[in-house]
Amino acid sequence: MGKSVLLVDMDEGLRCLDLLLGVDHKVVFDLSDILNGAPISNGTYTLASNQLINVIPAPAKIGDITAASLEAFAKKVKTMYDVVIFDFPAGLDFSLYTAIGSDTQFFAVCNPDPVSVRDAAAVCASLPQTEYDARLIINRFDAEYIRKKIYSNIDDIIDISGFRLLGLVPQSRDLMLLSVTHKIKPKTKAFKALYRIARRLLGEEVRLPRIKKI
């Protein structure tokens, strides 16, 4: 789509984006090094498959990220890339979110199962709603489970979670194997779903397809 993108892995001690995207073998520096004064370029790794997508791995140990250092870092990288995505771990600790700035969009990702939806509702209830444009991405979506009423329908998931829907990502073999293949085939349903989400983020009006086509 022609946009430069930076992915920042915030999951201290349990980083995974470098492995999922195939740059783990290159990693020498990570986010903690940058926050402690190293040049941003030292800890930034570009995907071989797309020169516009870059990743900064999370610190290898817990406790290296502070609100002050993250705030300064966030302000700087926002001027360097068209899109910056901070990938936070699951949980209700929002202490670092405010360091990124109130102009940030917030995306909660949940599966359609009842436990995950309830967790999303807890996140929504705890999030300072006045500060964030908050949306929901439903991951591992399976239309068959909805049809058979094993899981709640999409409207119920939205109502229970409390978030506005941004998009649906279907259960996909490509996504399951991402840590091995590091890519998603362009003609797959998963790729098309992620592309729809990206277009919406850029301000396009993109309708949700019929459920069985997701």
Give the ranges of each region predicted by the language model.
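G-domain G4 guanine-recognition motif of GTPases
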Residues: 111-112, 135-148, 168-175
